[in-house]
Amino acid sequence: KEIQKAQINEVLPQKYIDTLIRMGITIHEGTTPPIVNGIYLANPTILLASTVVGDIIGNTFSDIKVKLTDQDNTNFGIKLYGKKLLGENDTSIVTAISGSGNNFTVYGKVKASATPTNYAIFAIVISGTLSADGIVNYQDALINIDNSKGATYFIPEGTGRLIKDGNNLASTTSFF
């Protein structure tokens, strides 16, 4: 449990997790997360909460693909890749996982690239329940924590969003 706590805190300081919890993300704690390696498609994606000026709750966003690989329940590491999660192509810098039974939460610090020279660093949490068809009750929450190279491609630094899958299932898919 201490290894997991250290891993999660390396990924996301508690203040960011607390902010995402205030926005409404579900956090599944525990040291026995299910093996979630796979590719998942969230669509439609619906905005549940936001601190971004001008956002309208209920708006939809582009379909999101999430690829989770190399899960290790000894050190609670996992790799996270995204398409349209934040930008065109998203890659985790450091990531951790928690959960028990079929419930899990992935914590990531992700580099979102808009162009080869424009990128931002986001804190992101993905949460849900693993099923045979994908991730039930899929949610993802994000905060821009470093927009120094992001220009105007991303939401302002310090702001965040909570998004869910509109039909409550991010379906398993084979193509990333």
Predicted regions span which residues?
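Amphipathic/hydrophobic helical signal segments and adjacent flexible N-terminal regions
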Residues: 1-54, 165-176
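Low-complexity, flexible helical/coil segments
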Residues: 28, 74-79, 143-145
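Residues that flank catalytic or metal-binding motifs in active/ligand-binding sites
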Residues: 36, 62-64, 122-124
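Residue-level recognition of well-ordered beta-strand positions that form the cores
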Residues: 41-43, 109, 129, 141-142
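N-terminal glycine/threonine-rich, aromatic-flanked beta-hairpin/loop signature
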Residues: 42, 46-92
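Short, cysteine-centered beta-strand-loop-beta hairpins and adjacent loop/turn segments enriched
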Residues: 47-58, 85-89, 112-120, 144-155
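Contiguous, well-ordered beta-strand patches that form the walls/edges
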Residues: 70-136
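Glycine-rich, aromatic-bearing surface loops/beta-hairpins
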Residues: 118-176
